[in-house]
Amino acid sequence: MFFAIPQALSFSLFGIPMFGVDTCGFNGNTDEELCNRWMQLSAFFPFYRNHNELSAISQEPYIWASVIEASKTAMSIRYSLLPYIYTLFYNAHTTGSTVMRALAWEFPTDPSLASADRQFLLGPSIMVTPVLEQGASSVNGVFPGLAHGEIWYDWYTQSAVTGVSPGQNVTIAAPLGHIPVYVRGGSVLPMQEPGYTTEASRNNPWGVLVALNREGAASGSLYVDDGQSLTPNATLEVELVVADSTLYVSTRGTYVDHNALANVTVLGVGAAPGNVTLNGQPVQSYARYNSSSGVLSLTGLNNLMSGGAWVQDWMLKWG
């Protein structure tokens, strides 16, 4: 498991973005702790499978109760991020960009990251800091870009990481079953409610996660097609941009996705907004603001836009 990250990053450099390892190990017998940690780590790799030789013991996630729960947690995150991951693969196919990335590739001016291979990025927006040592309940990691105003948000609490100095190697709590994941400020992540299969997930409502940077801005993109055809007859591209407390969504393409927009979550909102509108119409009753975490959540939006989340351009404003 320790060598899985540098191996994956090497294949990214080789121009082979669809890479994964034999999760829980291939040769010899695994154990509960190793499989627990590895099932969570591999959930953030481009290719994800559990596989071993016939002579080894069974290592399906359901063999151990703790691995079941750890796998469900990580796979739920992976499945909710499938639209983001699919878009990363589209960009890799069309532009040669990478899916799994070393910290140094995104922050090339920081020489301290040149040999960092215990953390990695999934695309530009998701940072993963896994436990790679037996018996550990914490892990050391850095938060790159802090010297230049970068913000990182904890995936689970949705709060901004604070109290960390630029370049500081921080000890992060990571009990068995928990893998630290962070969202980069300045990102907009289109997501879908996770289903039991990728096909089921593709038919679920949409959500948008906005992580504001220090200037209150963010951006992201989405690529959608039928998910099956080798040469799609119709495609859809969506641009999502945040400026001046407004999320602007613009679409282009001929593919029609009828799944509704269910929720929008904005991280890093400094104060409770006095007014929230969707395409100029008040939606304040759908909004909740958490002053301690700085999170603005809008839920239950399913019936507000007829036809689907991406059938037309739209604008969400708070302030």
Language-model features: locations:
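Residue-level detector of beta-strand structural context in well-folded domains
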Residues: 117-118, 139, 238, 274, ...
